[in-house]
């Protein structure tokens, strides 16, 4: 099987796109007149039923515990299910994935042996997660099959899957999808829905953009194209639109302000030598469901995790130095709640949804305001409360913190001696 859940026959990990330096120019506030810009609205009076979705989808939505669409779902789904091209920027945790999952499942008419929808994303973890969302929402659509394809898995497994039980929806990373398409194992001639998640990450990397373009040219001219991301600079938006025909543009709470709903943000000034002791104190003092601790390198992730385990903290780490099989096993272990602390590099900084995470600690300062946005967006997702704490240990750290505050017009205060649990812990 090519599905990530089968965890078999993994090869050595291939080149990782996700650890590339991220250089995203500042976004301006102004977008063209077609764009939709609104502030955060927690609960809309209208429900998912108002979108006239299939009963099978509504049933799966109820099973998942969703009662009301988020703002981005409210803005996007009615147009997306009509087949319109969509480009959407909305901050982390606002339910962008469900927009294209539900819209695709609503429209798809599965035909045996034909791939109708293609979803591309830049990391294997994100591909695995998106595939699971399709599986979750297609519970009552048994004829619709979805599979995930990415590097690090023996390509023969993927070829056999496509030959024996071709899925209707393919989720994957550009490199592996292109390899399968070039060798004629994966036919894209019937694709009706072409989706890029975290599109800026793929289109800013020239290598990945070339792969995406080549894949795009293998699909029919007449298809729906949807692109989503938490960060879309003014410079990358025209690149996105080259793939589209008169897209509907939705910029929910455009990036001028970082107002992640319910997220409390603080910093701590300290020396490099004081970080371990302070982290230990925080983990003892704070109430948390699960916490993600971000560091700047593979070696620091491994060392810090070892230290935490020695101090009897329920910690696990994920970084790009591991085999894909090991990374996936650890990700599943954390997501399922077997461990409460995750030490990670920026590999986990984009797109990974774990609902129980309510605290993010930047043990090492991120390298840019964009990276900060993606990291702290791991806490307080789905409109729940959360806390982000950033260690500031140098002049360059202070500079990045100032950039974050200026760019997102947010006032990040020093962590007080006492912090009210109710401000960051879901009730």
Curated annotation (Swiss-Prot):
It holds the Pfam family DEAD. This is DEAD-box ATP-dependent RNA helicase 15. Residues 9-23 have a biased composition (Acidic residues). Interacts with ALY2 and MOS11. Keywords: ATP-binding, Helicase, Hydrolase, mRNA processing, mRNA splicing, mRNA transport, Nucleotide-binding, Nucleus, RNA-binding, Transport. ATP binds at residues 90-97. One of its GO terms (cellular component) is plasmodesma. Residues 278-423 form the Helicase C-terminal domain. It catalyses: ATP + H2O = ADP + phosphate + H(+). GO terms for biological process: mRNA processing; mRNA transport; response to cadmium ion; RNA splicing. The lineage of its organism: Eukaryota, Viridiplantae, Streptophyta, Embryophyta, Tracheophyta. The keyword NAD does not apply. CDD domains: DEADc_DDX39 (cd17950), SF2_C_DEAD (cd18787). ATP-dependent RNA helicase involved in pre-mRNA splicing. Required for the export of mRNA out of the nucleus. In addition to ssRNA and dsRNA, binds dsDNA, but not ssDNA. A motif (Q motif) lies at residues 46-74. Its EC number is 3.6.4.13. The Q motif is unique to and characteristic of the DEAD box family of RNA helicases and controls ATP binding and hydrolysis. GO terms for molecular function: ATP binding; ATP hydrolysis activity; double-stranded DNA binding; double-stranded RNA binding; mRNA binding; RNA helicase activity; single-stranded RNA binding. It is an enzyme of class 3 (hydrolase). InterPro entries: DEAD/DEAH_box_helicase_dom (IPR011545), Helicase_ATP-bd (IPR014001), Helicase_C-like (IPR001650), P-loop_NTPase (IPR027417), RNA_helicase_DEAD_Q_motif (IPR014014). Residues 77-250 form the Helicase ATP-binding domain. It comes from Arabidopsis thaliana (Mouse-ear cress). It comes from the Eukaryota. Belongs to the DEAD box helicase family. DECD subfamily. The keyword ATP-binding applies.
């Amino acid at each position: 099987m090519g599905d990530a859940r089968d965890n078999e026959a993994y090869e050595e990990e291939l080149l990782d796109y996700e650890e590339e330096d991220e250089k995203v120019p500042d976004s301006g506030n102004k977008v063209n007149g077609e764009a939709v810009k609104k502030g955060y609205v927690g609960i809309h009076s209208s429900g998912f039923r108002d979108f006239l979705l299939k009963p099978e989808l509504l049933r799966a939505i109820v099973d998942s515990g969703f009662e009301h669409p988020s703002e981005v779902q409210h803005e996007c789904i009615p147009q997306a299910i009509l087949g319109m091209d969509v480009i959407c920027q909305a901050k982390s945790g606002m339910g962008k994935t469900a927009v294209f999952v539900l819209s695709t499942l609503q429209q798809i008419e599965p035909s045996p042996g034909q791939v109708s929808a293609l979803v591309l994303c830049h990391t294997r973890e994100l591909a695995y997660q998106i595939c699971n969302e399709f599986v979750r929402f297609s519970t009552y659509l048994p004829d619709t099959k979805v599979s995930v394809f990415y590097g690090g898995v023996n390509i023969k497994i993927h070829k056999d899957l496509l030959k024996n039980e071709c899925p209707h929806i393919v989720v994957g990373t550009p490199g592996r999808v292109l390899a399968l398409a070039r060798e004629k194992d994966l036919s894209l001639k019937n694709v009706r829905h072409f989706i890029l998640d975290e599109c800026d990450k793929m289109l800013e990397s020239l290598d990945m953009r070339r792969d995406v373009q080549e894949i795009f040219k293998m699909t029919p001219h007449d298809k729906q194209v949807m692109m989503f991301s938490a960060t879309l600079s003014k410079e990358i938006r025209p690149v996105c639109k080259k793939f589209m025909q008169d897209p509907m543009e939705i910029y929910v709470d455009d990036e001028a302000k970082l107002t992640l709903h319910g997220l409390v943000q603080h910093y701590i000034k300290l020396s490099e030598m004081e970080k371990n002791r302070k982290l230990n104190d925080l983990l003892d003092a704070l109430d948390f469901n699960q916490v993600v601790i971000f560091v700047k390198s593979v070696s620091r992730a491994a060392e810090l995790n070892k230290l935490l385990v020695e101090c009897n903290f329920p910690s696990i780490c994920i970084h790009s130095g591991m085999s894909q099989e090991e990374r996936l096993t650890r990700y599943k272990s954390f997501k399922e709640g077997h461990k409460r602390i995750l030490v990670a590099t920026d590999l986990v900084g984009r797109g990974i949804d774990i609902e129980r995470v309510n605290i993010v600690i930047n043990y090492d300062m991120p390298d840019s305001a964009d990276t900060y946005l993606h990291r702290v967006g791991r806490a307080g997702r789905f409109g729940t409360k959360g806390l982000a704490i950033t260690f500031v240990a140098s002049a360059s750290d202070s500079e990045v913190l100032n950039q974050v505050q200026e760019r997102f017009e947010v006032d990040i205060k020093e962590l007080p001696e006492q912090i009210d649990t109710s401000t960051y812990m879901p009730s």
